[in-house]
Amino acid sequence: MAGIFIYGLSPSFCPDVVAVNVSHIFLQMALWRSSDNLVYLPPTPVSKVLSTDDYVTRTNIYYYAGSSRLLTVGHPYFAIPKSSNSKMDIPKVSAFQYRVFRVRLPDPNKFGLPDARIYNPDAERLVWACTGVEVGRGLPLGVGLSGHPLYNKLDDTENSNIAHGDIGKDSRDNISVDNKQTQLCIVGCTPPMGEHWGKGTPCKQNASPGDCPPLELITAPIQDGDMVDTGYGAMDFGNLQSNKSDVPLDICQTTCKYPDYLGMAAEPYGDSMFFYLRKEQLFARHFLNRAGMAGDTVPDALYIKGDSQSGGRDKIGSAVYCPTPSGSMVTSETQLFNKPYWLRRAQGHNNGICWANQLFVTVVDTTRSTNMTLCVSTETSATYDATKFKEYLRHGEEYDLQFIFQLCKVTLTPEIMAYLHTMNSTLLEDWNFGLTLPPSTSLEDTYRFLTSSAITCQKDAPPTEKQDPYAKLNFWDVDLKDRFSLDLSQFPLGRKFLMQLGVGTRSSISVRKRSATTTSRTAAAKRKRTKK
């Protein structure tokens, strides 16, 4: 750092000068110095996702489509496979399972339209937009119990009067619970996504037996038959609970999933969830603790040890507490089903457009969880003998799906086609559009006589069939290709839709009235009155 110093005149150098007050002036030059702070570059711009309203034109043509009565019956706790001892093949059907309906729609471009001038097939393509939906539920309201004959229950920690420090080898008991109450409906054109806690990968390889496994949040599609959260959490019980007795039978060897609302709401194109309806209800009925060795010991600083004469309090009991869930009362006043819902504005960028001519409707309804008990006698007896009766357990469900679809068209400009190909490349293939590949710059071989035996076989490989992207997933298929109708007034949901639009639904058949006959006298009288 350079500096310039200017001193005042000193009297010793100038004897003729009278001494005055002298001050020193210091001037310092400012030099540029590089900053130690980080320089942040502007972020990369995010590619803009268009709303379907920007390139989809809606028409004034609406169709009604509805399924038949959808029924399913099975065992509420487990599936019974066919074996040598059992000739029955009973599936697992529980009210605490997801019902994921894959609704297949007809191709509107191959549909018999009332007016062929609606769209230009050379420059436009037709798509369906879901504007109304009603999920009907049959059968009465009821509460179904779940449980385990060997449930891991040690002490009643709600009304306990002694601390049991000594744990026996087996203290399991027969416990039943009424699970968490859930009503759910998710509508989208792709399968919904669920999340659950699973077993992760440990960082250290020398893990000892009995160490707590790491947890990992896993996201996977929700399939038909997957279990919902029943009050014990969304987790993989088969891999995280080795004793098979910490939860009821219906979930002790399966995975309970919870809808990934955050992930589906943040999805760029908004295909998996147009909208959703949800109602959850839960409270803790009983409080207990678990039997087993304490994996995480309670620190000594958190309690004062008891004396050996204090009635068993010298050793603390299990501190792994767990409640038994309860969904409480079910009532028709809080039902989400058997009523119409109209889609005006979806939560994402897809405003109800059914890409690939399909729709996914995910339903959960635990308010109709009644488990039917069937009793069959093995032999006739004059007196009651419980050993001469067989008890069976079954659960049945009834559904009805109704929709209102609006006919829409997409103008295939080069920009829109490029955008649709980026979003879903199979859409253009379904619409018989292909991409022209750029010419190759390398030299290729072309034989003249293709059928000659002197050259290698020139038979082209057979074209691969289009693969279903959801072929490995399990859904309840509902085919509505032959169930579309323009007569909205002939169906329950169609009449409700017309009432929303303010359109009358009365019949247009007019009653013919016979005109009254006029006599010549009346006509003459009228002519007479007109004379002046």
Curated annotation (Swiss-Prot):
GO terms for biological process: endocytosis involved in viral entry into host cell; virion attachment to host cell. One of its GO terms (cellular component) is T=7 icosahedral viral capsid. Signal peptide: none annotated. Forms an icosahedral capsid with a T=7 symmetry and a 50 nm diameter. The capsid is composed of 72 pentamers linked to each other by disulfide bonds and associated with L2 proteins. Binds to heparan sulfate proteoglycans on cell surface of basal layer keratinocytes to provide initial virion attachment. This binding mediates a conformational change in the virus capsid that facilitates efficient infection. The virion enters the host cell via endocytosis. During virus trafficking, L1 protein dissociates from the viral DNA and the genomic DNA is released to the host nucleus. InterPro entries: Capsid_L1_Papillomavir, Capsid_L1_sf_Papillomavir, dsDNA_vir_gr_I_capsid. The gene is L1. Keywords: Capsid protein, Disulfide bond, Host nucleus, Host-virus interaction, Late protein, T=7 icosahedral capsid protein, Viral attachment to host cell, Viral penetration into host cytoplasm, Virion, Virus endocytosis by host, Virus entry into host cell. Pfam families: Late_protein_L1. Self-assembles into homopentamers. The capsid has an icosahedral symmetry and consists of 72 capsomers, with each capsomer being a pentamer of L1. Interacts with the minor capsid protein L2; this interaction is necessary for viral genome encapsidation. Interacts with protein E2; this interaction enhances E2-dependent replication and transcription activation. Residues 512-532 are annotated as: Disordered. GO terms for molecular function: structural molecule activity. This is Major capsid protein L1. Its main location: virion.
